[in-house]
Curated annotation (Swiss-Prot):
This is S-adenosylmethionine synthase. The gene is metK. Residues 99-109 are annotated as: Flexible loop. K(+) binds at E43. GO terms for biological process: one-carbon metabolic process; S-adenosylmethionine biosynthetic process. It is an enzyme of class 2 (transferase). Belongs to the AdoMet synthase family. It catalyses: L-methionine + ATP + H2O = S-adenosyl-L-methionine + phosphate + diphosphate. Pathway: Amino-acid biosynthesis; S-adenosyl-L-methionine biosynthesis; S-adenosyl-L-methionine from L-methionine: step 1/1. Keywords: ATP-binding, Cytoplasm, Magnesium, Metal-binding, Nucleotide-binding, One-carbon metabolism, Potassium, Transferase. GO terms for molecular function: ATP binding; magnesium ion binding; methionine adenosyltransferase activity. Its EC number is 2.5.1.6.
């Protein structure tokens, strides 16, 4: 059977782009906690000694944005000027406006409601906050129904942060990246071909020490032994030095790690970022709903792989289109799956927000290490509570 390689990457919470995602989502969470109806589009950029927060926010709540910024940066670990970025001394600039009235009128009352079409409770009044396409995906490669490459890459990044924060590897700094190449035989993952870790460190530690510690305390703790062999390639800080990192090394922006946030390139992506957006933005809520649908289809045994595309128009509640691809692994036709999705999942933005309880402040938790396949936190879009209904209707079981 033909063999091929597939690679996915992840980054730690100290990566400049991820700092921005976490700041944007910490602001969103703080606003939702005080005013669940907050409309938020919050973007962040970080560079040497500076954080800029800009966006459009409509809310009855007040939050101290500079304080939230400093708390978030402190939690990540940038607490000393020698790291190139310091939570206590960095400048914080804010530029916040209200949400555009033109956008608000489309979200506040969807087109179907305005034209007198069917209104169920208040759900139909919530139109999509923008046009766009969103994809959801699931596969049975891992217990969490995620592709193996991105799953391993995220676990390596989380472990890299864990050994830093616990002091097990005390010379590490917050910035870091991981990358995993998996070798497949047909559709089955058979081994890890390559592991790459770039970890920011203090300037006095040797490369040999870094390599030894990261192999023993990170790679071997994360990657199952049966997937590693003598031919597995391991690269640790291949440039030879990673002292300057974080915002001092690279400018960061919210929404620049959309592939890391989702499926590591294993599935298609509609292009919309998640962080800093309240759930009326379908870039976020519909992508979560699409994952929920795909995961339940795979968990029900109706396909080994499932990708779903949703399309929305601003101000219109119902999806314009639903497309499902099971890559030849479906136990029923894709037309049947679309029929089941329409029957068992309400994909209007208002219904997604209601069913997945998306007005709660849960977003900072997923702003690093992936929004999907998380086993460390209970996420509503990761639940498989539709499995029995889907299996019964599809297979008669």
């Amino acid at each position: 059977m033909a063999r091929h390689l597939f690679t996915s990457e992840s980054v730690t919470e100290g990566h400049p782009d991820k700092i921005c995602d976490q700041i944007s989502d910490s602001i969103l969470d703080a606003l939702l906690e005080k005013d669940p109806q907050s409309r938020v589009a919050c973007e962040t950029t970080v560079t040497t000694g500076l954080v800029l927060v800009a966006g459009e926010i409509s809310t009855s709540a007040y939050v101290d944005i500079p304080k939230l910024v400093r708390e978030t940066v402190r939690e990540i670990g940038y607490t000393r000027a020698k790291y190139g970025f310091d939570c206590d001394t960095c400048a914080v600039i804010t530029s916040i406006d209200e949400q555009s009235g033109d956008i608000a009128m489309g979200v506040d009352e969807g087109l179907e409601s305005k034209t007198g079409e069917e209104i169920e409770e208040e759900i139909e009044k919530v139109g999509a906050g923008d046009q766009g396409i969103m994809f959801g995906f699931a596969c049975n490669e891992t217990p969490e129904l995620m592709p193996l490459p991105i799953s391993l890459a995220h676990k390596l990044s989380r472990r890299l942060t864990e050994v830093r924060k616990t002091g097990l590897v005390d010379y590490l700094r917050p910035d870091g990246k991981t990358q995993v190449t998996v070798e497949y035989e047909g559709s089955k993952a058979v081994r890890v071909h390559t592991v790459l870790i770039s970890a920011q460190h203090c300037e006095t530690v040797s490369n040999d020490k870094i390599r030894e510690d990261l192999i023993n305390h990170v790679i071997k703790e994360v990657i199952p032994a049966e997937l590693l062999d003598e031919e597995t390639k391991i690269y640790i800080n291949p440039t030879g030095r990673f002292v300057i990192g974080g915002p001092q090394g690279d400018t960061g922006l919210t929404g620049r790690k959309i592939i890391i946030d989702t499926y590591g390139g294993y599935s298609r992506h509609g292009g919309g970022a998640f962080s800093g957006k309240d759930p009326t933005k379908v870039d976020r809520s519909a992508a979560y709903a699409a994952r929920y649908v795909a995961k339940n289809i795979v968990a029900a045994g109706l396909a080994d792989k499932c990708e779903i595309e949703l399309a929305y128009a601003i101000g219109i509640a119902r999806p314009l289109s639903i497309f499902i691809d099971t890559f030849g692994t479906g136990k029923v036709s894709e037309e049947k799956l679309v029929e089941l999705v329409n029957k068992h999942f309400d994909l209007r933005p208002g219904a997604i927000i209601r069913d997945l309880d998306l007005r709660k402040p849960l977003y900072k938790k997923v702003a690093a290490y992936g929004h999907f396949g998380r086993t460390d936190i209970d996420l509503p879009w990761e639940r498989t509570d539709k499995v029995e209904q889907l299996r019964k209707d599809a297979l008669g079981e």
